[in-house]
Every structure is written in C-alpha cells, then in structure tokens.
C-alpha cells in the first residue's frame, strides 16, 4: 500500500473511532437545584472507573421541551415527577423513571439586607414588607418555583408578595439573584442554600413542607441511551449516591 494511501487509511480509521467514542458519551440534563450534589455524585461515579459524562444544568421544564424537540440528552435528572412522566407519555423515555430524592424548599435572605427570617407568620410578613424584590424560579418551568407559589398562597402571604416577585429560568439563577443582591429574599432548594458560595452571603429558613406539594424528584432514561447513561442511572440509586444526596438536605426513597 503506498505510504500516502496508508496514512489516509489510518487517519480515516482514527476519525471513525473518535466519532464512535464521542457518540457514546452520555449527555445528562440536570435540574439546577442538584448542581452541588450532582457534582459530588459525578466525582464518585468516575472514581469507580466509569467514563466521564457530559453534564448540562438548567430547568426541568426547559430540558423537557428541548428533548421533545430532539435534543440529544440521554438522561434527565429532574426536579419533579411531572416532566419525566410526560416524556414517557410522549414516547421519549424507556419508562416513567424512578424517584431518586425528595427536595426541601427554603427561604433565603441576603445577609446585608438585614431581614430576619422566622417561621412566625408575623415575622414573615415583616420580612416580605421590608424586601425590595423576592426571587423565585418560573413555576411553569421549575418545581421549586411552583412550590414557592403554593407556599405563599397556603400561608396567606401571596397578596403582599406577588408584586415583589422576580422570576428566573431555574432555581439556581433565582438563588444567585439573592446572592448578588438583585433580590433581598428568595425561594430555593436547601441543597443550594447550604452550598459554600450561597451560605457565606445568605441565611435560610426551612419552609413548612405541609404547605406545598412534595417535591419528588424523578429521573428518567431516554430511548437509545448509551451504556454509560444506564450505568449512571443505576449509580444514582446506589447507597453511595443516596448518602451524598442526604448530606445536601434531600430525603431519599
């Protein structure tokens, strides 16, 4: 075989192998509230000799819409149960998936705002009245935003809070509105409130979980997902992953 032909053959073979490897890399869509916990879980997954996965963070609603329109996500780590079940109904996933965690809603306040958080309704009214803006995730896209509105209405705080609300595409962005001072108060996941970046700038208060629908976070595997996505799906249900989730404030099944 002439040398130039051999070189072309080897180069073509290299391209084919590279494309095959890239095509098999799992792409995981992860709800923003899971960012810190998922990062640690992913590190643990790789430490067991598994291949790296590509990770994208955002809102469960946006991810669902993107998957419906052909986005190549192999695994959705959602912040609720509605969106994964909808993907199954639309024939995108292999089944309805499983609940991997139950989230907790909290209120956070910017330390420099000087707003006291208390589970006393009187104190909450004072806090809301003092706040300039209150950040939440968009309720149609993010389960933690939906839970925040349910809480405000159930607690009788909706009328004094509604005109101060500013909406973010996901709970991670809503949280950063408070961290950066764009809002004095906000609703977020306890896992984000406990993160180093957020906790040094804010304080938080747990919201009564009886005042909003349980945030049962479900994950679902798409049809045609590569083996690595299936491996990660199984790892998320392991005792090691559950221990990490619990550390970040989640309950696990």
Region spans (language model):
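Sec/Tat signal peptide C-region and signal peptidase I cleavage site
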Residues: 17-23
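Bacterial N-terminal signal peptides that target proteins for export
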Residues: 1-10
């Amino acid at each position: 075989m002439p040398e130039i032909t051999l070189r072309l053959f080897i180069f073509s073979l290299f391209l084919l192998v590279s494309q095959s490897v890239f095509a098999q890399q799992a792409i995981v869509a992860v709800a923003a509230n899971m960012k810190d916990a998922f990062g640690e879980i992913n590190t643990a997954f790789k430490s067991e000799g598994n291949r790296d996965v590509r990770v994208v963070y955002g809102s469960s609603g946006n991810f669902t819409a993107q998957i419906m329109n052909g986005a190549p996500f192999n695994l959705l780590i959602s912040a609720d149960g509605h969106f994964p079940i909808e993907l199954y109904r639309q024939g995108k996933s292999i089944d309805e998936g499983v609940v991997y965690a139950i989230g907790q809603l909290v209120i956070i306040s910017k330390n420099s705002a000087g707003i006291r958080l208390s589970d006393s309704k009187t104190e909450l009214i004072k806090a809301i009245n003092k706040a300039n803006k209150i950040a939440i995730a968009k309720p149609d896209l993010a389960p933690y935003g939906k839970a925040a509105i349910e809480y405000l209405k159930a607690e009788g705080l909706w009328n004094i809070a509604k005109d101060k609300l500013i909406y973010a595409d996901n709970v991670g962005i809503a949280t950063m509105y408070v961290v950066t001072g764009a809002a004095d108060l906000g609703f977020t996941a306890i896992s984000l409130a406990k993160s180093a970046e957020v906790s040094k700038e804010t304080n938080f208060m747990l919201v009564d979980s009886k005042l909003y629908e349980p945030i049962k976070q479900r994950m679902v595997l798409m049809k045609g997902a590569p083996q690595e996505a299936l491996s990660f799906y199984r790892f998320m249900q392991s005792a090691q992953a559950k221990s990490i989730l619990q550390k970040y404030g989640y309950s696990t099944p």
